Amino acid sequence: MGYTEYFEAGKASSTPTMLGYQAEGAAPFIKGSRVEKPETIATAIRIGNPQSWDQALKLSKESNGWFDSFSDKEILATQKLLTEKEGIFCEPASAISVAGALRDIKSGKIPDHSSVVCTLTGHGLKDPDTAISQCDTGSMININPTLDEVKKAILDNM
C-alpha cells in the first residue's frame, strides 16, 4: 500500500485512484460474492475468492476507484494489440489492465489528460499456448539455416 505512506511522508503530492479489472468468468468484486468455479483464459487472475478481498475493497473506496470486468475475447484482443502496436508480449492477465484503461478513457471515466499507469507483470511466455492459439500462422515455409535465407523469407512475406 506504499502510495499512502509516501503521501503522508511528503514524498508524493497525491495518491492514485486504484482500479481493479477482472475477467468476467472470475469476477467476485463485480458480482459481490465468491465465484465457486472461476473460469477464464487469463489463468493468473482465475480467482474466485481473493485473499485480500477486504483490503482491495477498502483501497478502491478510499481512492475513489472502481472495479470492472472483461470477456476473454476482450482480454485476448488487448494482448494482441499490445504485441502488434507496442511490441509488448504479456500474458492475458496482464493485458486486462490496459483493456480497462482503454475502455475507461474512451468512456470518459478516466478524465482526459490523466496520468495512467498500467502494471503488466506477466510475460507472454508464462502462457505461450494461449498466445500461439491466437495467431494466424499462415503456411509454414522451410528454409536453410542461414542469415541470408532468414532475411529473404522475412522480406518475401511482408
Question: What are the residue ranges of the model-derived segments?
Answer:
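Active-site/ligand-binding loops adjacent to catalytic centers
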Residues: Y3-F89, S133-M158
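Catalytic phosphate/nucleotide-handling subdomain of diverse soluble enzymes
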Residues: V98-M158
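Short glycine/serine- and small hydrophobic-enriched flexible loop segments
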Residues: M1-E5, K58, A99-K106
